[in-house]
């Protein structure tokens, strides 16, 4: 969180890549009735007052302990993986052919989804900058969320490419353009 994954995704789109945000996929899943029904069955109407998922309430309940989080991930991650697979298939027949199809997947390695991609990119940034960015977006609980994720170094060690995003958006986009050229080869 706060490393610049969403900014990187926007840059890839400007550079001509097809893009998909796994976060947006998750948000759309929370609007599907079969998902809402399962969430309400698990945690009660508090997670979906008036039929719409309250993501803050869901987060409080789902991340209260490991079993609750694992249950939610078991529900959501396979659905996300299916939509990512459909996106990938669509990208293969897209006209004109894009230089790459890029999926922003915040918990890529934690979800064990890295194997479905041809390459992975870890976008990392210094901790203080990440805190500033996260706070600017209303995400104050960076330490709590980070505790449930691999460290930036672990992600960098597992990624095909590593982008250090401590500079400007223009610098980030220039670095991503170089990666996009390599991916298009």
What is the predicted function of each stretch?
Residues 3:
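ATP-binding Walker
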Residues 23, 72, 102, 163, ...:
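Residue-level signal for inorganic ion chemistry
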Residues 85-135:
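ATP-dependent NMP and nucleoside kinases share a basic, alpha-helical "lid"
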Residues 13-22:
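Post-Walker A helix-loop "phosphate-sensing" segment adjacent to the P-loop in P-loop NTPases
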Residues 24-100:
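ATP-dependent small-molecule kinase phosphotransfer cores
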Residues 83-84, 115-116, 127, 133-185:
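Small-molecule kinase domains that catalyze NTP-dependent phosphoryl transfer to phosphate-bearing small molecules
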Residues 6:
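Walker A/P-loop
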Residues 15, 36-40, 81, 127-135:
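An amphipathic alpha-helix signature
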């Amino acid at each position: 969180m706060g490393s610049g994954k969403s900014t990187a995704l926007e840059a890839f789109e400007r550079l001509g890549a097809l893009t998909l945000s796994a976060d947006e996929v998750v948000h759309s899943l929370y609007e599907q009735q079969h998902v809402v029904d399962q969430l309400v069955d698990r945690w009660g109407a508090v997670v979906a007052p008036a039929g719409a998922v309250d993501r803050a309430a869901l987060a409080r309940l789902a991340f209260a302990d490991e079993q609750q989080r694992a249950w939610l991930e078991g529900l959501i991650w396979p659905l996300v993986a299916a939509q990512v697979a459909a996106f990938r298939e669509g990208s293969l027949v897209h006209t004109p052919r894009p230089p790459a199809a890029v999926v922003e997947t915040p918990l890529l390695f934690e979800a064990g989804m890295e194997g479905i991609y041809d390459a992975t990119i870890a976008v990392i940034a210094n901790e203080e900058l990440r805190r500033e960015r996260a706070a600017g977006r209303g995400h104050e609980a960076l330490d709590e969320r980070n505790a449930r994720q691999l460290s930036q170094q672990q992600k960098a060690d597992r990624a095909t490419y590593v982008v250090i995003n401590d500079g400007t958006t223009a610098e980030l986009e220039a670095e991503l353009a170089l990666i996009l050229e390599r991916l298009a080869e």
